[in-house]
Amino acid sequence: MAHIYRPKHHVRFVTASSLFDGHDASINIMRRILQASGAEVIHLGHNRSVEEIVNAAIQEDVQGIAVSSYQGGHMEFFKYMYDLLQERGASHIRIYGGGGGVIIPREIKELHEYGIARIFSPEDGRRLGLQGMINVMLEECDFPTVTVVTDELERLPSGDVQAIARLITLCEYRAEGENKEAAAAAEAAIEQVKALEKRVPVLGITGTGGAGKSSLTDELVRRFLNEIPDIKIAILSVDPTKQKTGGALLGDRIRMNSINSPRVYMRSLATRHSRTELSPAIRDAISVVKAAGFDLVIIETSGIGQGDAAITEVCDVSMYVMTSEFGAPTQLEKIDMIDYADLIVINKFERKGSEDAKRQVQKQYQRSHQLFDRDVSEMPVYGTIASQFNDPGTNTLFVALVDTINKKAGTNWKTSLKTVANVEKHNVIIPNERRYYLREIAETVRSYHRRAEQQVEVARRLFQIEGAIEAAKERGEAEDVIRALETLKADYEAKLTPESKRILATWEETKAKYAAKQFVTKVRDKEIVTELTTKTLSGLDIPKVVLPKFKDYGEILRWVYKENVPGSFPYTAGVFPFKRQGEDPKRQFAGEGTPERTNRRFHYLCKEDKAKRLSTAFDSVTLYGEDPDYRPDIFGKVGESGVSVCTLDDMKKLYKGFDLCDPLTSVSMTINGPAPILLAMFMNTAIDQQVEKKEAELGRPLTPEEYEQVKEWTLQTVRGTVQADILKEDQGQNTCIFSTDFALKMMGDIQEYFIKHRVRNYYSVSISGYHIAEAGANPITQLAFTLANGFTYVEYYLSRGMHIDDFAPNLSFFFSNGLDPEYSVIGRVARRIWAIVMREKYGANERSQKLKYHIQTSGRSLHAQEIDFNDIRTTLQALLAIYDNCNSLHTNAYDEAITTPTEESVRRAMAIQLIITKEFGLTKNENPLQGSFIIEELTDLVEEAVLQEFERLNDRGGVLGAMEMQYQRGKIQDESLYYETKKHTGELPIIGVNTFLNPNPPSEDELNNIQLARATYEEKETQIRNLREFQERNKDKAGPALERLKQVATSGGNIFEELMETVKVASLGQITRALYEVGGQYRRNM
């Protein structure tokens, strides 16, 4: 067991992932170990700007900041953070960081010299281990932030943030009495603070754990800021201390979107030794913020039990937050806060039974307060859905809250918000009556297999009876014996279903077809002739598809029901009869710097290919829906790890020279949060391209009617995929930017637009497990969560009135391939489950039953140590994907562990695929996995494990209910920690990383000389200049266009249809900000 350093002082850390960076797996592991080692951790989550991190660190009076940065731009990010701390007089706060192999030794050295306390490298991780790195951080930060009072009291009345923070820390020292020197200084200071106190209302918010107090607090703060001019708010948020370790997770900040305002101060406090829901320093802390000139103090407690009501002793107005899940009505009689609270909130009011719960609470409140002369409906009990943007129930609560504060505290605040009698969910994703869909799906698959197995037993008996008849005839048995057997045979034949009879009747014909020289198939009324054998150098004919040599009817049925030939239900071996000739599944990502630079890379990648299969990686600024800017933490990320695209002009430059409507051209875009905006830019690019061709052909501008014809033809012809999978973003990758319901609404709008305009060749979503795997999930979890997400989209689109066969063909999937054994069958299991469910449960047609998926080799399996070995891993993963008949494949470059791929590394990655498909002999056969005992066993094992995961998700309220409970994220993080622990202990051997180590490791100079693909300063400047030129050119049109977009969104219209127009005159960042106003920002979860 590793030694754990236990700090002598209360060490506090702010932890986060850097701006435009969703890779939070490692920082979550770090913050967990920090807590377990005794630190108080204020976790901000992913995608945090330097400004947000520094503000939080100063307000929280921490000793250290720990940030992970995996998306490039780290030099600017960390230096800017250091500079900002110096500028704001907080030079004592130490900065720690890490980014795997992305931050190379010379950059680490430069950052250390600049003043960053420590940037941990993969070598540090190997040498020190996870706990060892945490020990270094704790030991270096084990000091008090304040011991004496200097000029804090003079700076306090002006609201100086550092003065407030330091004085609250002194309040904590005073309450504990452990630091005698600090406690004495605090004693004197607090007496002076009390003399400066003003009369300020204090709102206390308390409630059960998990009731949504932080989200509700954030929504109330947003309304206070919007409704009451110039109001200044202080929030004191309390979370429990772990008595065993002394550590605490102070997690309320992560839920707050409204606090990044100069009018808001927030401080997180741990309960430490108080043994209640409040910090022992809470009264003194309230005095400090009152003296600092705030107009409202909000106290949010940790989760409480039935008998807790301490909040009422320190506030003027108290609010109790609960949900409908309190058990029997008699339980309400035990809740002290119902006796004391001024306002009671039933949050998460969309849940079943909330209306009944509200009435029960109203009755209990009426009894507790002896208000029998008033109608029960007048009791101050309010239903809210705080997670819903601009929730009418929260508006009604806010109006009542302002009225209560005015009455009890003598304020004269006004609000223009309207009240409602009934609270409803605006955009219901899964209707209540469909909430058990995942359990139904699991049962559908098992039922199919049970029926198949029953048919197998019938067919086997039939085969045995036929054999007995034949044997009896050969021996010359009596006619009555043979008649009895014939009768028995007829009985068993009658038990066969028509489908089973058809399979058996056509089996020999099927075998004959595949034994022929050629095979003719039809795809969309077009005949395709396929040669069925390939001659080896030795002169043997290798068949494309091999069928089993079964004679037993039972074995034939089992094989067809569970496996079947590629292109036939249940599509276990593949959704098409044969691979497409002349178009390998090869697809290579590109994305770096400016659109012009990436365009050149695209042309380089496919210069020798007839088929142009382009996959686009966007930089993190684009992934988060923002525009390039000179601010250092943004500037450093522009064009790093992807291409910068923020206008329609950029999109046109990106695909210049490619005919986007050529049947051999296909474009995939890896974009999620702002996907509707980028997709609108892409579709406009394709349309404008065809319009220009048509106008050149005609020698004149098109008429409006001709333009519409070209537009419709383009939409129906263009091929490609946009990722746009918002569920997996919340669960794993974290590039969510809009509130989840609003983001899903836009996904549905895209699909409705596709149906209306008959977009048949473009996938509206790529339901992705890749990023779930990259965040740390094992292969079974990846597959289960991804398929569950897919079925959730199916249920949502059906609830919007779309027909299954109108949208299912627009759904595609995306998986990772690692080296675990389960990856050998990930495609087989996915195809079989999808096909069975689509046919048996949803009544979908053949096209809708076919699950098509892209594979990318595992990025997580690429290691910064011995990077040359990565190509070996990638080769094995690519081989698995090709054996399993994936529809499209991207092979990672070996140097992606440390940089955006270079031309040399990309060429090697492409060669891996080419060698497998062109040189490796067994790939001439297209069903090499069929007939393998281990593959069949693994397929069944993985399928059942996936169905069990569906049931676990179902029991938590389906995919969305589980997301609310953080089930998926928690499971992914647990599996990530398990993997990392095994890797660090060496139990999981990783060649070149923890075993078979290089006896002559590369020197620091050699590591520093590795070629890195980075965007240049000039490229970043070019993007900003181009953006501003676009905005200037459209300055008169952008405002009205954005207003129209907001109007469509608020009126429930099709947002994507309007975006097709908006993108012509507004930039990505402008559109994103407009949509935030009407749809709300994503709220991070712990």
From Swiss-Prot:
Q: Where does Mg(2+) 1 bind?
A: 214, 252, 300
Annotated positions binding Mg(2+) 2? 238-239, 252, 300-301
Gene Ontology BP term (one)? acyl-CoA metabolic process
Region span, GTPase chaperone MeaI? 153-407
* Linker as annotated region, ranges: 408-570
- Residues that bind substrate, according to the entry? 578, 613, 719, 763, 812, 847, 852
Provide the alphabetized UniProt keywords: Chaperone, Cobalamin, Cobalt, GTP-binding, Hydrolase, Isomerase, Magnesium, Metal-binding, Multifunctional enzyme, Nucleotide-binding
User: Which GO molecular function annotation, any one, does this entry have?
Assistant: GTP binding
Named cofactor requirement(s): adenosylcob(III)alamin; Mg(2+)
Q: Which reaction does it catalyse?
A: 2-methylpropanoyl-CoA = butanoyl-CoA; 3-methylbutanoyl-CoA = 2,2-dimethylpropanoyl-CoA; GTP + H2O = GDP + phosphate + H(+)
Which residues participate in GTP binding?
A: 210-215, 255, 347-350, 964, 1085
Free-text comment on this protein's domains from its UniProt entry: Is composed of four functional domains: the N-terminal 5'-deoxyadenosylcobalamin binding region that is homologous to the small subunit of ICM (IcmB), a middle P-loop GTPase domain (MeaI) that likely acts as a chaperone for ICM, a structured linker region involved in dimer formation, and a C-terminal part that is homologous to the large substrate-binding subunit of ICM (IcmA).
Subunit structure comment from the entry: Homodimer.
Q: Briefly state the protein's biological role.
A: Catalyzes the reversible interconversion of isobutyryl-CoA and n-butyryl-CoA, and to a lesser extent, of pivalyl-CoA and isovaleryl-CoA, using radical chemistry. Also exhibits GTPase activity, associated with its G-protein domain (MeaI) that functions as a chaperone that assists cofactor delivery and proper holo-enzyme assembly. Also displays ATPase activity. Is not able to convert 3-hydroxybutyryl-CoA to 2-hydroxyisobutyryl-CoA. Does not exhibit methylmalonyl-CoA mutase (MCM) activity.
Q: What is this protein called?
A: Fused isobutyryl-CoA mutase
Q: Per the UniProt entry, what species is this protein from, by scientific name?
A: Geobacillus kaustophilus (strain HTA426)
